[in-house]
Amino acid sequence: MKEANTRRYIYLCLVVVLLSIIITTEAEDDRLFCIRHHKYCGHRPKRCCSGLFCRCNTFGTNCRCQSKGALGKLI
């Protein structure tokens, strides 16, 4: 009986650890899975890393993660 309780306790500890990893990963999702500077972002415009935003040309194509210009940094 004691062995079964020990196994249950270990199993529950593992579940708690895995859930905390999943929650932490979701909270840090932008930092872990962001699109870097000068990379294509047309399919996910809100996924650029911090300090960057998705800029496209006049026709809405060739979208890339870029930093804000001088005027954009002041605003």
From Swiss-Prot:
- Where is this protein found? Secreted
- As annotated in Swiss-Prot or TrEMBL, what is the tissue specificity of this protein? Expressed by the venom gland and the whole body.
- The record's principal subcellular location, in a coarse class, is secreted
Q: Which UniProt keywords apply?
A: Disulfide bond, Ion channel impairing toxin, Neurotoxin, Potassium channel impairing toxin, Secreted, Signal, Toxin, Voltage-gated potassium channel impairing toxin, Voltage-gated sodium channel impairing toxin
Spell out the disulfide connections: C34-C49, C41-C54, C48-C65, C56-C63
- Signal peptide (residue range): 1-27
Top-rank taxon: Eukaryota
Residues that make up the propeptide removed upon maturation: 28-30
Further remark, if any? Negative results: Does not show activity on potassium channels Shaker, Kv1.4/KCNA4, Kv2.1/KCNB1, Kv3.1/KCNC1, Kv4.2/KCND2, Kv10.1/KCNH1/EAG1, Kv11.1/KCNH2/ERG1, and calcium channels Cav3.1/CACNA1G, Cav3.2/CACNA1H and Cav3.3/CACNA1I.
Domain description from the entry? The presence of a 'disulfide through disulfide knot' structurally defines this protein as a knottin.
Q: What does this protein do?
A: Probable neurotoxin. Strongly inhibits voltage-gated potassium channels (Kv1.1/KCNA1, Kv1.2/KCNA2, Kv1.3/KCNA3, and Kv1.6/KCNA6, with the highest toxicity against Kv1.1 (85.1% inhibition at 1 uM)) and mildly inhibits sodium channels (Nav1.2/SCN2A, Nav1.4/SCN4A, Nav1.5/SCN5A, Nav1.6/SCN8A, and BgNav). Induces activation of protein kinase A type II (PKA-II) and MAP kinase Erk1/2 in primary nociceptive and non-nociceptive sensory neurons. Does not show cytotoxic activity. Does not have an impact on Ca2+, cAMP, and NO signaling in the cell types analyzed.
Sequence similarity = Belongs to the xibalbin-13 family.
Protein name per the record: Xibalbin-13 2
Species the sequence originates in: Xibalbanus tulumensis (Blind cave remipede)
